[in-house]
């Protein structure tokens, strides 16, 4: 027997649905009825239904009402009637909205919204009222859908935050209809045909269809779960459709969100030797469930012809004209493909230094940094956004005072570089003096003078050896000095930090002390977002020769590649993961580590220097987002010992899972080239971090025997963009506010703390209201488990004194924190890095 639904659809009749409806009617009145009595009433209802067709939902419900009344269950029957009236009212609202918009298919979307969201808080009648206020005569159906979506966005409030999910569903409905129409016009059906079309148009990398058969693409299409689109907030879906999915050259999106995730998975699993389609599925699942986000370049560029997947690069600028211009050229090429850059200027001679023996000839680092600044502005990624670069200088460099005023608004504009991000590399000695005696002298020197007089580069040392050589240089009268007090430098640093958010801080001794690959090199600085700490070395010019090749005269320049650092990033979305479930967490970390390792081999490198270093070290940076989201969901206050203990446990588990996954990869695919002699191999990595339990000792032995696939594993990026995609909080930062409205390009976007509710409200304390000493302590706790660094911001208000800000820097140094990113003053707007938005 069949039954006709209210939509007109005819489906098989299921009598158990009647039984369930009657049970709900009784339980709604707090009444329990014997199953035998219910079965008897059901039997009466069934006997009264027509057997010769024409059965409808309305007829069934009418008979249920009559039977309830006849059996004396008047209150239940009354409630049942009222329930039917309520459902009828809901149907009228959604049908009316669909009719006003002129889109019959919209009714199904609205029906699901009514099913998934509480009617008392999210009534479609409120959406209809708001929508009608936006409607104008002669609006097209698409314009009406935009107005309906805008209405849902504007209904988002602290009391009703889930309207942003409803707005996302409406946006997705509009996009899906438009996208389906585009492909129908092109006569394209199915995923394989779509990929063939995109490949032929030069929008998809031809390597995907070259490596996967049609059968495999068809299998992958079966992995797609369109229902996961409901995980998006409006802000996340809007961002994804505008920036991440493949677009035509006229900027129309041609990929669904799920097709984007699957395309990334196909790319990342491409080289898997066995079980490749299983890895495609695992990569797709972790991305589409929003449990892991890849960095913005990976999300944007995987599956495309120019698949530059890395976020940031770091170069050591040599002290030569050729070397400086080579570094600037390297930055331009990196920026062209969307990468951010960190440049270490600590080797470049200071203002007034000698050139070829001519005293006072050198112009110093500022003029070169201005050249970098202009390159960042000029190479703007097809007009999308200008390049991004952090410039690092040592705390003892002679040009430091001018460097610390690069972005401030006062002073000589010819000495400014407003589009770069300055950062200072501090030795322990500086903080020791700042702690004990701010009036202590601090001697600034030129690296070229030191190299000329002493025969060594002071910046090539760290820790006690650096301090011994620094004091030796201070006492050598042949080396010119610019002597100031520690207080003078601190004052310049803090003034700039409060005014501009920079300079970033890099604690070079803490970094090198915990470097697992200190046997192979030195870390001079970090990257654009201060989360990367890997061995560095400048590119060296070897020779320039004139040759004859095929009858032509050619000039050949040979260089030694140095160590040009590359950052391959992804983030665990802690707010979306069951972090207490060891098995689930380990499987997720294993999948993410494997995906990142594959990035190294599948990447399109803008420079050969980058490719060589990346294959030599195979460094990755697995980080986290949703940190505050995770705490709030569990009822953990930011300013509490419970927070510190929980963070310690979670990050130890993440680190354990990452190392375990990495050594298993080494057994399967081989170690990185410099494993022998590393802290991984000697066990010093585990000793330095106090990992002494039985399971850690066992893991250390396994690592020593099997090796490590990747030289560096963990690094916490800011995730400013990808955290919006996954509907969680950014990186390890507290939320800025529980709720606020952001204006972007003429529209108002609601920003809501993830899963904001009465349960989480009090655990979402705003960033600027938090005692920052708790943030510093938490960073110190996490740092023990992170082999690289963290993009950690400090949030200050206008009430902070300079001494209080200095105290935070000192607390961070004492806690072993390696880097500090922005000082975010409440009155200051700072730019977020899009490259490291993993």
Language-model features: locations:
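Often metal-dependent polyanion-binding catalytic scaffolds in large enzymes
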Residues: 1-255
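Alpha-helix capping and helix-loop boundary segments enriched in small/acidic/polar residues
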Residues: 6-13, 33, 101, 139, ...
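A glycine-rich phosphate-binding loop feature that marks nucleotide/adenosyl-phosphate handling sites
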Residues: 41, 61-65, 81-86, 130-131, ...
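Terminal amphipathic helices with adjacent charged low-complexity linkers/tails
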Residues: 79-89, 93, 163-195, 426, ...
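Conserved, charged catalytic cores of large soluble enzymes
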Residues: 180-274, 357-371, 383-387, 392-527, ...
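Catalytic alpha/beta core of large soluble enzyme barrels
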Residues: 213-221, 225, 229-238, 530-534, ...
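Function-dense linear segments that define catalytic or interfacial modules
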Residues: 246, 252, 261-276, 280, ...
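Internal maturation/activation junctions in enzymes
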Residues: 286, 304, 328, 588-611, ...
